[in-house]
Curated annotation (Swiss-Prot):
Oligomer and partners: The 4 large subunits of the cytochrome b6-f complex are cytochrome b6, subunit IV (17 kDa polypeptide, petD), cytochrome f and the Rieske protein, while the 4 small subunits are PetG, PetL, PetM and PetN. The complex functions as a dimer.
Name used for this protein in its record: Cytochrome f
Organism: Tetradesmus obliquus (Green alga)
Compartment(s) of residence: Plastid, Chloroplast thylakoid membrane
Short name of any one Pfam family annotated for the protein: Apocytochr_F_N
Signal peptide: 1-35
Cofactor requirements of the protein: heme
Residues the entry annotates as binding heme: Y36, C56, C59, H60
Length: 320
């Protein structure tokens, strides 16, 4: 299994992601707000904000459900699997960067507790490797190995992913204790509605910026983009450019108000996040618990035997 390392150089990061997508057969790399964790990597030192929201939600505005499954407790220095699920209707198609329709991609970020990290290939059992498949997980940054990202990858194939994780050992890592820890997961399907610079993609609704009457609706490029000219009360002409993708729902001669939709909302995807907890279990506690249970069981057996012995003595005295 080959795991990527994050490059500080933006071009190097894009080449890395592009190479891995080609290996997966993802050839439709339009410069659109896909499920790109690299956008978060380039713009945010930490993908989880102080209010608990994962930054992917800044570009993927619709909320959709996600699922995260991990063991309730794990032992130190143990490989376990986290299963993430990004469900969606796989019959629907999204608007691509060129305005045409295509299948949805998915992406995810998994924020593990400090000390937890992606399991080395030589520690992953063969059965788990088969579940992981050809997915390549990479750390969010060189100093954040506990944060893993992947995507964009084909949603039809990877709406469910298995991540092999290595738990830390407090005996060798003094920054880790036997405690209960939170795990944060964010997953999205489909393209985003906003780019990191705040500009809109063609996968969102476009609204009027003024009050006025629509005087003209005309195409402005070969891809299918449309210009909507709005005449205001003071005689100004405001041109709203709609890229190929969203469908215009207004007509010439119609009066519109500020923030009134000029198009439908073509977005069929969305982002969701899930928080769970996992316990790093102390083996000595388990051993102590087993000894306690064994002691209780032994005491119960002795009580039963003592009771039977007492009953026999009573019966003998009565017969005498």
């Amino acid at each position: 299994m080959n795991f990527f390392t994050h490059k500080k150089n933006n071009f190097g990061s894009f080449v890395t992601i592009f190479s891995f997508l080609v290996a997966l057969g993802v050839t439709n790399l339009t410069p659109a707000a896909e499920a790109y964790p690299i956008f978060a990597q380039q713009n945010y030192e930490n993908p989880r904000e102080a209010n608990g929201r994962i930054v992917c939600a800044n570009c993927h505005l619709a909320q959709k459900p996600v699922e995260l499954e991990v063991p309730q407790a794990v032992l130190p220095d143990t490989v376990f699997e986290a299963v993430v699920k990004i469900p969606y209707d796989q019959q629907v198609q999204q608007v691509l960067g060129n305005g045409k329709k295509g299948d949805l991609n998915v992406g995810m970020v998994l924020i593990l507790p400090d000390g937890f990290e992606l399991a080395p290939a030589d520690r992953v059992p063969e059965e788990m490797k088969k579940k992981v498949g050809k997915l390549f997980y990479q750390p969010y940054s060189p100093d954040k190995k506990n944060i893993l990202v992947v995507g964009p990858v084909p949603g039809k194939k990877y709406s469910e992913m298995v991540i092999p994780i290595l738990s830390p050992d407090p005996a060798t890592n003094k920054n880790v204790s036997f405690l209960k820890y939170p795990i944060y997961f964010g997953g999205n399907r489909g393209r985003g509605q906003v780019y990191p610079d705040g500009s809109k993609s063609n996968n969102t609704v476009y609204n009027s910026s003024v009050t006025g009457k629509i005087s003209n609706i005309a195409p402005f490029d070969k891809k299918g983009g449309v210009e909507i000219t709005i005449e205001t009360a003071n005689g100004d002409s405001i041109v709203e450019k709609i890229p190929a993708g969203p469908q215009v729902i207004v007509t010439q001669g119609q009066t519109v108000q500020p923030d009134q939709p000029l198009t439908n909302n073509p977005n069929v995807g969305g982002f969701g996040q899930k928080d769970v907890e996992i316990v790093l279990q102390n083996p000595a506690r388990i051993q102590g618990l087993l000894v306690f249970f064994a002691t209780v069981l032994f005491a119960q057996v002795l009580l039963v035997l003592k009771k039977k012995q007492f009953e026999k003595v009573q019966l003998a005295e009565m017969n005498f």
